[in-house]
Amino acid sequence: MKKIFTIIFMAGMALNAAAQLDNGFYRIKNTTTGRYIVMYDPYVLVNKATGTVNLGALQTITSFNTVRSHMGSVWYMEGKGDSQYDLYCQHSSLGSNSSGFYPKLYSLGDSYRIYGEYSGFTKYLSDVDDEDTGEGYVSVNGNNINWEFVPIGGDNYVGIKPETSADGYYWATFMSGFPFKLGSGMKAFYVNKITDHGFAMSEMGDEIPAKIPVLIRLNGSSPSDNKITLMKSSSASAPSGNKMYGTWYSSDLGGRHEDWNVKCESKNRVLGESGGRLAFVRGSGVIEHNRGYIDASSSADDAIIESTNGINSIEKNDNTEKGVYTLTGQKVPEGENLRPGIYIKDGQKVVIK
């Protein structure tokens, strides 16, 4: 695995104030600019001899509407003693990828300065304006060196942005570097079968293991409708036979920053819809960060459509049983008006337009 940012942190002068920051999930917000740190990719250069670093992969973003659904904005802080912290983001951490070099925090009360020390150098992280984008990036040069660690929760939530709407619901693929629990009303599935024409999915529990791409039936069109609870650990196990692959980054910073991107090839299919039905379809360009996709054979259709065949939640019911069911096996109350979509009625597939 490539080094995530052997960042940063070189120094020399010891700072006296002890940082009191509990282990947990945070977003890191600059107190001067109001921008949040977002990790676009893990490409960072460090020159230990001079103490200079290139932190261009760590961009700063103003809009909470952007960061609320961007896993690159979520950091798990774990104290290592002596004001040192390991910072976990996406699929790795600073400490595990930098030979044990950890950043330190200098407490100012409600905010902190993030610094490091190496071979006589002390470097503070600063938020520097980017004139080209109107946003910013993290650097060890600059004056905006005070940061607020905002705990994840409440208004500072993590929500999933839909990719498509189909069969009467909003849907998204999603992969997190941390285990998480679905919000009420959401359901997760993994793809357990793929043919040239269709795919089948199987329902999972509400706790999803880390680093597992899944397909999620959402509550609504906004990330605020689709909140999840992040966890440092979980007893949930990875499903056997998951056919999905996942992405971590979709950096647009150019050069080697884009080495970790996944570009759509002819065999790849990303989540979409076909004729109102849930499908994996041909895509183009770079697949978005923290999403899932499947691979298809050279003879496969452009749109591989969801099929009721092989869905565990439906297989558990006798197809001759009377009643109306959704494609995920949920029985619709008798007399309820059906939204447009595909249903199983008395064992037969029906389409409501």
What residue ranges belong to the model's regions?
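Extracellular glycan-recognition/adhesion modules and their associated mucin-like linkers
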Residues: Q20-A49, S63-E131, V140-N156
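Short, flexible beta-strand-to-coil junctions
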Residues: K29-G34, D41, G81, C89-S93, ...
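A short, polar beta-strand/turn micro-motif
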Residues: L21, E148-L182, G205-I311, K353
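Positively charged n-region of N-terminal signal peptides that target proteins for export
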Residues: M1-I4, K353
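C-terminal outer-membrane/trafficking sorting elements
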Residues: L15, T308-K353
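Self-processing/autoproteolytic domain segments and adjacent N-terminal interaction modules in large
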Residues: N54, Q59-I61, N65-V67, G72, ...
